C-alpha cells in the first residue's frame, strides 16, 4: 500500500485489517482491527490524527482528512460508502455514511445513524443516536427503532468478512482472454442485501435483524 511518514509520524495498521494497494495513508493515521480500506481511499493525517476504529469500512474513493483543531474519528463498525468526504469530524459507532455524502468540520454523527447519499452535513452539526440524516444542507428527518438499524456491524458484516478474505484471497493477476465456464461456481456466496429505507429489501433486512436480535 502507498504509506507515507509525515514529519516522522508513520501510519499504523492492525495486521487483521486490509488496505488495498491503491489506497493511500499519510502521517498520523491509525487503523484498528478488522477494517477494510478500499481502492482509491485517501486517509491524510498531515494536519491532525485520523483514527479508524475496528470493523470499519472505508470504501472506494473516500477522502478522510483531519484539521488542526480536532482529530477525525471513525468509530467502531462505521461504514463510509463510495466517494464520501469525511473532514475533521466524528462518525459514530455503527453509522453508515451514504455514497458521495460530505461531513464537514466539527460535525458529530451519532451512533447508528444513516446519512443518505449525496447529503451535506454542515460544520458543527450534532445528530442524535439512530437518526436518518438527509439533504443539502442535511437535517434529521426521523429516528430509527433499534430493529431498523440493519447495517449494524458486530464483526460479522460483509465488509468485515471481505477484509479477512482479502488478506489471503485478493491477488493481483493478469486478465484472462475469455471467461471460464465454471466462473460463477468459483464465487463465494454472499448474503449481502443493499440498504433501503422502504420496499421488499428493507423488509427483508428488518426481518433478518429482528430474528437475530431475538436469539
Predicted regions and their residues:
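Extended, small-residue-rich solenoid/repeat segments and analogous flexible loops
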Residues: 1-34, 42, 192-215
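Small cofactor-carrier domains centered on a conserved lysine used for covalent cofactor attachment
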Residues: 38, 59
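Glycine-rich hexapeptide-repeat left-handed beta-helix
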Residues: 1-8, 12, 46, 54, ...
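Short Cys/His-rich Zn2+-coordinating modules
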Residues: 16-18, 37, 76, 97
